[in-house]
A protein has these predicted regions:
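Polyanionic (Asp/Glu-rich) segments that form extended negatively charged tracts
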Residues: 1-22
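Conserved structured core elements
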Residues: 7-14, 30, 34, 130, ...
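Generic hydrophobic alpha-helical scaffold/packing signal
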Residues: 18, 37, 137-140, 160, ...
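Short helix-capping/linker segments at secondary-structure and domain boundaries
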Residues: 22-31, 111-118
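Short secondary-structure subsegments characteristic of cysteine-rich extracellular domains
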Residues: 31-44
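Intrinsically disordered, low-complexity N-proximal targeting/linker segments that flank membranes
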Residues: 45-136, 144
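Short beta-strand-alpha-helix junction that forms the catalytic/metal-binding core
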Residues: 134, 146-169
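Domain-exit/linker segments immediately C-terminal to small folded modules
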Residues: 172-175
Length: 175
């Protein structure tokens, strides 16, 4: 349920999933779903493909082969960089950062609702590639955080997904 490719942490992440669906013609079942989700989050939150992507893809194809057999892969060599909630608070939001993109995938997976209408937010690839996208908005206004001496105004956890219409017509008009 990640509706747009612009928020995928790495394009290379598609390769293992394409491999899976090439060999398994039907939808994943049971533990395969759980193992594919685990693979996605481990690869996404570990900066997995930030260097030596080809060798890591070869390792990950072996993991996918295990998942095809409904076996859980070993991830001893994959370090997930999330030790505490403070790690998220300390991370500055950037659309080029794979870690931020992973969190955006988590937000998009939850099918965000419009603050005003409660309708589904339409996410658009063309806008999600840039940090000043109409779909991104600071949850707590930067001026409010500065005025109250509250930490990192550009924190990843201070970003919300909003409809382009709400951001353009309502929020910006009041800023």
């Amino acid at each position: 349920r990640i509706p747009v490719s612009a928020i995928l942490p790495y394009d290379a992440l598609l390769v293992p999933f394409i491999y899976f669906f090439y060999y398994q013609k039907e939808n994943p079942k049971g533990t395969q779903i759980k193992y594919l989700e685990e693979f996605f989050w481990r690869a996404s939150l570990s900066f997995r493909y930030s260097s030596a992507a080809e060798s890591k893809l070869a390792q990950d194809i072996k993991r996918i082969e295990k998942i095809l057999n409904s076996e859980r892969p070993n991830y001893d060599d994959v370090k997930v960089y999330l030790n505490s909630p403070q790690d998220l608070i300390d991370t500055n939001f950037s659309t080029g950062n794979s870690y931020c993109k992973a969190v955006l995938c988590l937000l998009a997976y939850q099918e965000p609702k419009d603050f005003q209408t409660n309708g589904k937010i339409i996410l658009d690839n063309s806008w999600l590639k840039v940090a000043n996208s109409r779909n991104y908005h600071h949850f707590f206004p930067k001026a409010y955080l500065r005025k109250n001496n509250i930490g990192n105004e550009h924190s990843l956890v201070n970003i919300s997904l909003v409809s382009a219409d709400l951001n353009k017509r309502k929020i910006r008009a009041q800023a």
